[in-house]
């Protein structure tokens, strides 16, 4: 039961992404290398960059399991994503692997004006439904270069924007989807 009504009956209210929880949350400039960042809890992220931090990540592994409990929050705000950039942060990821095997676990998600994620020379693989590769909403930006992105679940585009405000760029990317309703590129 949510909001006093059975699941699916009450309208869902999007929450403020600044309240999201995660395994690793970075709020100041930082460099990270050769790290394993995982999360197995519903509605949490493996990694969150926030507070206008500039974060450089190399040769690391990110993994997420644990299904979302709110489609709206995971689709539009980035809750339950593997890597989430908010509050004008800039996350630069190189030479890494990003995977998820849970519903509503987008791999790389930027939301909010000034939030930018640059991903290069990285493999991305999502296995469950509503789990996109690169996703941006509310004026967030994700730039990809030399990527292999594979999605297996339904409604899991490799490149996606939503809410009419989001920017994705992809250069030298191999993009593969196999789930129902999963175009390679999706934008609204």
Positions of PLM-derived features:
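N-terminal segments that cap or nucleate solenoid repeat domains
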Residues: 1-71, 92
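Extracellular beta-strand/beta-solenoid scaffold signature
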Residues: 7-21, 41-48, 70-84, 102-110, ...
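All-beta strand scaffolds that present successive hydrophobic residues in beta-strands
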Residues: 15, 26-35, 54-59, 90-95, ...
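Intrinsically disordered, low-complexity segments enriched in polar/charged residues with Gly/Pro
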Residues: 32-35, 69-71, 84, 95-96, ...
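Beta-rich extracellular carbohydrate-active architectures
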Residues: 36-39, 61-67, 97-100, 123-126, ...
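Surface-exposed, polar helix/loop patches in the mature regions of secreted/periplasmic/lumenal proteins
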Residues: 91-125
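...the same signal can extend to comparable exposed beta-sheet modules
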Residues: 113, 141-143, 150-152, 164-172, ...
């Amino acid at each position: 039961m949510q909001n006093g009504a059975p699941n699916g009956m009450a309208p869902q209210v999007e929450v403020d992404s600044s309240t999201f929880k995660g395994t690793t949350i970075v709020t100041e400039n930082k460099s990270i290398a050769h790290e394993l960042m995982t999360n197995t809890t519903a509605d949490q992220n493996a990694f969150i960059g926030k507070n206008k931090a500039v974060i450089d990540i190399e040769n690391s592994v990110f993994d997420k399991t644990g299904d979302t409990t709110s489609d709206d929050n995971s689709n539009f705000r980035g809750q339950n994503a593997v890597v989430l950039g908010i509050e004008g942060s800039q996350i630069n990821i190189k030479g890494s692997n990003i995977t998820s095997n849970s519903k509503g676990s987008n791999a790389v998600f930027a939301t909010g004006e000034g939030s930018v994620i640059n991903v290069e020379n990285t493999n991305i693989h999502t296995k469950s439904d509503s789990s996109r590769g690169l996703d941006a909403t509310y004026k967030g930006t994700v730039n990809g270069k030399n990527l292999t992105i594979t999605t297996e679940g339904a409604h899991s585009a490799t490149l996606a924007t939503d809410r009419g405000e989001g920017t994705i760029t992809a250069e030298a990317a191999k993009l593969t989807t196999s789930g129902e309703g999963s175009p390679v590129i999706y934008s609204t």
